[in-house]
Amino acid sequence: MLSFSEFIYEEFSKNDPIPEITKYKSKLGIVLLGLPGAGKSTFIKEFIQPRNSQFKSFSTDDVSLLYTKDPSKYHEKSSVLNIERLSKFITTGQNFIYDTTGGHERNIFRIVNESRKLGYHIIFIQLITDLETAKRRNLQRDRNADEVYIDFTNSRLSQNMELYSNFLKPESYYLVDTTSEYKFFKFQDGEILKRSFDKYI
């Protein structure tokens, strides 16, 4: 028989497209993937944080801003520094979000493997939007990514979905279309499942 808290979680999770966010108060790692302009920062603020405020987000842009104090400028060692900060943070057992374009596969493998050794649950959330929308939004950001980099990242993300799923084996791999209203999908056993009512089919 379910306890009251288990019953509440089960009922709530039926209506929540990513129930892990609410379920885990500690030791949940989210690898948040998406192009520049896909809306990663907005998704954290609008979707993740309202469901569970116990997350610390790590992004290269944030580290760069700490050093340059100017969002339009990029600090060359930001990516390395971001990974080192996150690597230290996971030893605390607190929830984290690794906000990344997915262009550095080695960093993703490192963080997931280190987290697993410390008992973390890992999920991937990949934000998807059409290339034109991403490029338009990118121009509206404080720091614009080069279009060549956006094209490169777009090709890598689509290629790496099976790589991450097969080799890193996250508990769940979600896809979220952020072009307009959020639409949720799940990548499972090599197939993309659509969300219908309270389940993915």
Positions of predicted regions on the chain:
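Pre-Walker A adenine-sensing motif
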Residues: E11-K23
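Conserved substrate/cofactor phosphate-moiety recognition/catalytic segment
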Residues: S41-N95
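Glycine-rich phosphate-binding loop used to anchor ATP phosphates in small-molecule kinases
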Residues: K77-I122
